[in-house]
Amino acid sequence: MAKATKKAEAKTVTIEQIGSPIRRPDVQQRTLIGLGLNKMHRRRTLEDTPSVRGMIRAVQHLVRIVDEK
């Protein structure tokens, strides 16, 4: 008989863009696009991984963390 396994729910983080990428360095604009953000006040729920946390840290003045689960 096969074991019933539950997948552990991945931790998530919801971020909102609060700053405009206009007149920002190209690397910051690309980081926002990499996070799935490109317009003001858009929200995106992403997996909470070290790479995502690093991207958030790189543009922390342009985004805010809304929710962490």
From Swiss-Prot:
What Gene Ontology terms describe where this protein resides (cellular component)? cytosolic large ribosomal subunit
The UniProt entry's GO biological process terms, in alphabetical order, are: translation
UniProt cross-references to Gene3D superfamilies, sorted A to Z: Ribosomal protein L30, ferredoxin-like fold domain
Q: Which SUPFAM superfamilies match?
A: Ribosomal protein L30p/L7e (SSF55129)
What keyword terms does UniProt attach to this protein? Ribonucleoprotein, Ribosomal protein
Q: Superkingdom of the source?
A: Bacteria
Q: Which InterPro entries match?
A: Ribo_uL30_ferredoxin-like_sf, Ribosomal_uL30_bac-type, Ribosomal_uL30_ferredoxin-like
Alphabetically, the GO molecular function entries are:
structural constituent of ribosome
State how it assembles: Part of the 50S ribosomal subunit.
Q: Which family does it belong to?
A: Belongs to the universal ribosomal protein uL30 family.
Q: What is this protein called?
A: Large ribosomal subunit protein uL30
Question: Which species is the source of this protein?
Answer: Rhizobium etli (strain ATCC 51251 / DSM 11541 / JCM 21823 / NBRC 15573 / CFN 42)
